[in-house]
């Protein structure tokens, strides 16, 4: 009976979106790819460059933050704010109440920006493209599950 209960718990855990094991993996891989302070600006700009390669129309969404010069201080600062928020959310994946409050706050901020599901999907593709270039091994399934948790929390 004890084995059956443990097995049932493992099945539930494995079927959960962004389960505990996936959370640990994503946190570890994010820390490796996001790197240290001196590398974060380049990493962040690379993420946005890839976003614009995937969805060129999204570039217009950033006209107010200096996107015309992707190496400008204004655009770099914006990129760092976005990846800083992503860093914060990834660190909260195992803290349901905290991440839910943070996602609700970010959803409120993004509601007025006329974003749709395709914008969040494109950012997810950019993450899935850039993060692995900084790793020896990348778990696409775990990242897909955990990014979906974040994106759906912001986009509603």
Swiss-Prot record:
One of its GO terms (molecular function) is heme binding. InterPro entries: Globin (IPR000971), Globin-like_sf (IPR009050), Globin/Proto (IPR012292), Haemoglobin_extracell (IPR014610), Mb-like_M (IPR044399). Residues 1-16 form the signal peptide. Gene3D superfamilies: Globins. The extracellular giant hemoglobin is able to bind and transport oxygen and hydrosulfide simultaneously and reversibly at two different sites. The 400 kDa hemoglobin consists of a spherical 24-mer arranged as a double layer of dome-shaped dodecamers. Each dodecamer is composed of the 3-fold trimer of the tetramer A1-A2-B1-B2 having one intra-tetramer (A1-B2) disulfide bond and one inter-tetramer (B1-B2) disulfide bond per tetramer. This is Extracellular giant hemoglobin major globin subunit A1. It comes from Oligobrachia mashikoi.
């Amino acid at each position: 009976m004890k084995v059956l209960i443990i097995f049932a718990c493992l099945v539930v855990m494995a079927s959960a979106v962004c389960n505990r094991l996936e959370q640990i993996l994503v946190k570890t891989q994010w820390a490796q790819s996001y790197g240290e302070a001196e590398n974060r600006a380049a990493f962040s700009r690379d993420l946005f460059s890839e976003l614009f390669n995937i969805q060129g129309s999204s570039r217009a969404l950033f006209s107010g933050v200096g996107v015309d010069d992707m190496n400008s201080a204004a655009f770099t600062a914006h990129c760092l704010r976005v990846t800083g928020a992503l860093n914060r959310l990834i660190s909260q994946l195992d803290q349901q109440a905290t991440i839910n409050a943070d996602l609700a706050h970010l959803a409120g901020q993004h509601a007025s920006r006329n974003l749709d599901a395709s914008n969040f999907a494109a950012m997810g593709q950019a993450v899935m493209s850039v993060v692995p270039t900084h790793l020896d091994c990348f778990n696409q399934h775990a990242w897909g599950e955990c990014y979906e948790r974040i994106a759906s929390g912001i986009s509603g």
